[in-house]
């Protein structure tokens, strides 16, 4: 109702203040037994922090690195970072210098070298298509689990998934999806 009347900021505050804790709990409960724990989680950030928060809570990663673009500094500080600070405990922020494949791939690779681990995942939910494609290719090349947060129902009034309809979609699992070589 708030969004329909043009009160988008109030609708966003209502969502985070009233609904989001339940969304997190529901998401974590629904992914139990379906999502394996990982040592390191890489997340590509777009304009909404919710998917990153949901994925981190579900996977319980020991290390979490969130990547974002330089063009989002103002938006990041005002609209995204407060929610990351509120809902996540331990994470590292890394800014991509630009959105080129080479920069994204190399930045992800550098962070992987800094955080050696057995089990990695990369959440490709957020970011521009170039970022998502680069991150997915990197994840496949480096035997990461590649995943994203999807939804079964979208609420145009909220301008986000209907609370409780979020789903963790496991796109690629290196232990199951490696092609056979003859």
PLM feature spans:
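Conserved TIR/SEFIR loop-to-helix hotspot centered on a Trp-containing motif
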Residues: 127
């Amino acid at each position: 109702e708030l969004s329909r009347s043009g009160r988008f900021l109030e609708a966003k505050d209502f969502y985070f203040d009233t609904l989001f804790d339940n969304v997190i709990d529901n998401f974590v409960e629904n992914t139990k037994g379906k999502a394996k724990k990982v040592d390191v989680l890489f997340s590509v950030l777009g304009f909404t922090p919710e998917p990153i928060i949901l994925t981190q809570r579900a996977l319980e990663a020991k290390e979490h690195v969130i990547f974002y673009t330089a063009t989002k500094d103002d938006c990041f500080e005002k609209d995204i970072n407060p929610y990351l600070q509120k809902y996540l405990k331990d994470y590292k922020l890394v800014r991509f210098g630009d959105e080129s494949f080479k920069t994204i791939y190399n930045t992800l690779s550098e962070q992987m070298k800094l955080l050696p681990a057995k089990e990695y995942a990369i959440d490709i939910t957020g970011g521009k298509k170039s970022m998502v494609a680069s991150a997915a290719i990197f994840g496949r090349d480096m035997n990461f689990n590649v995943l994203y947060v999807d939804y079964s129902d979208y609420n145009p009034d909220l301008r986000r998934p209907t609370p409780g309809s979020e789903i963790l979609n496991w796109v690629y699992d290196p232990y199951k999806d490696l092609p056979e070589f003859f």
